[in-house]
């Protein structure tokens, strides 16, 4: 949507620069699981519990269908739903959020819409999580979903059964999960402030000297 609007309103020579995210805190928080670690896989959700478009109830419905051991940590304010294997952390500091994501195996973003970007997806990727996200345009972009090597696993928007299948797929396939985690780390680097600030400076420089911008 952002790129289409850009071309229609600003012309084909305009340049789209991604949002910048401070990923350093999340990179440092990574705590990879040891090979002999037999704890259930850790799944994390972050969002306002009482806002339907954040998709918590979609996630909880999916978790009820997962026939594998897991634990889920829910971050965010609102009214908890007391279901098995789910812990509510409430509102947390940025450092606490980084530590929770750094310990997690999978981050789930079941949002149904109204998202212009997906900062927390980038944060989760930087922290080493495999990202599972609803198939909405903002998340497709962050996950580089149309590339040969997507950095996230998308499920049908609002479909708890499809989300359950995606989660079970990653729980059952540690190698696939590890590939997504590595791609996520690499994808998060694209949105890091250091990288984005370089692109901004390149745009300023090319505007100043009149040359055409080619984003890397």
Question: Residue spans of the language-model regions?
Answer:
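A short, active-site helix/loop in glycosyltransferases that binds the activated sugar's phosphate group
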Residues: 1-16, 21-25
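Conserved acidic donor-binding segment of nucleotide-sugar-dependent glycosyltransferases
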Residues: 6, 145-160, 169-174
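Conserved donor-binding/catalytic core segment of Leloir-type glycosyltransferases
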Residues: 35-54, 60-64
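Nucleotide-activated donor-binding/catalytic signature segment of Leloir-type glycosyltransferases, i.e.
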Residues: 76-99, 106
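Short alpha-helical segment that forms part of, or immediately flanks, the ligand-binding pocket
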Residues: 98, 121-126, 137-141
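Short hydrophobic beta-strand element within catalytic cores of glycosyltransferases
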Residues: 106, 130-133, 140
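C-terminal alpha-helical cap of glycosyltransferases
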Residues: 169, 193-216
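A short, well-ordered alpha-helix in the C-terminal region of glycosyltransferases
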Residues: 176-190, 201-202, 206
């Amino acid at each position: 949507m952002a790129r289409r609007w850009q071309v229609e309103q600003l012309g084909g020579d305009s340049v789209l620069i991604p949002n910048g995210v401070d990923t350093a805190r999340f990179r440092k928080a990574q705590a990879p699981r040891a090979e002999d670690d037999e704890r259930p896989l850790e799944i994390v959700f972050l969002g306002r519990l009482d806002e339907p478009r954040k998709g918590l109830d979609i996630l909880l419905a999916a978790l009820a269908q997962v026939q594998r051991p897991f634990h889920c940590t829910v971050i965010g304010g609102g009214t908890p739903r007391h279901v098995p294997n789910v812990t509510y952390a409430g509102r947390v500091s940025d450092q606490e959020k980084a530590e929770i994501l750094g310990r997690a195996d999978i981050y789930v973003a079941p949002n149904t819409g109204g998202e212009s970007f997906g900062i927390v997806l980038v944060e989760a990727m930087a922290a080493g999580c495999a990202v599972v996200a609803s198939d909405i345009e903002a998340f497709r972009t962050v996950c580089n979903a149309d590339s040969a090597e997507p950095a996230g696993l998308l499920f049908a928007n609002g479909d708890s059964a499809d989300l359950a299948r995606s989660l079970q797929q990653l729980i059952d396939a540690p190698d696939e999960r590890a590939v997504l985690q590595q791609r996520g780390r690499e994808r998060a680097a694209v949105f890091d402030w250091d990288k984005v600030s370089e692109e901004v400076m390149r745009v300023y420089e090319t505007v100043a000297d009149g040359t055409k911008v080619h984003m890397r």
